[in-house]
Amino acid sequence: MIERSGNLIVISGPSGVGKSTLVKQARLELPYLEFSVSCTTRQPRAGEVNGKDYFFLTPEEFEAKVQNNEFLEYAGVFAHRYGTLKSEVVSRLQRGADVILDIDVQGAKQIRQAAAADPEIARAAQFIMIVPPDMATLEARLAGRNSETPESLKLRLAGAQEELSNFRVYDYLVVNDDLETAGKELIMLLKTVRMRTSTVIGEPFA
């Protein structure tokens, strides 16, 4: 029997592109997909469980992990910090799970840097960006939410354009013009990277 180590699936895409819906569909189809549990310095919300939803850390604990180089990537979001632990990802990869990291471009660049220094991350990391067919489509989707003011819509579009300008950081683009088609393409892509020879453990035919 062929045994496989997992892939680290880095997925990014601007707000309104349908990324969360596509990832949810893929997880329903592919049982070996998992999210890693991130660290955060924010307080737990009602019903959240430490170690399941997040690892809840004090700012001092978080900074200690930064100094000890324990994060694959980390960032500040408003007044709080979030990060992905190397140990959390590697343990899942070693038992054969494909680990999804839903992060922004800056986080993806940090993973690229980590891969340059770590052969296991370099082997495992696959970078996918979910993109709209064009900016006009994205603007229409964001406006259709009826949750944006003209000013906030303008800011979101500027942020999206900046994010999309970094598309060459990624290995693959999935264009979400039609949700059903994009969902099938993402699932096909995830199945394909699962079949890479670099995921095979040892010499199964020896």
Positions of predicted regions on the chain:
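Flexible beta-alpha connector loops of hexameric P-loop NTPases
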Residues: 72-79, 145-151
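N-terminal phosphate/diphosphate-binding loop that engages ATP/GTP or pyrophosphate donors
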Residues: 21-70
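Extreme N-terminal, non-catalytic leader segments
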Residues: 1-8
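NTP-dependent small-molecule kinase module
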Residues: 2, 140, 147-148, 162-206
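Conserved glycine(s) of the Walker
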Residues: 13, 18
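Short aromatic/basic micro-patch
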Residues: 55-57, 83, 102, 173
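Short glycine-/polar-rich loops that comprise or flank the Walker A/P-loop
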Residues: 6, 31, 121-126, 168-170
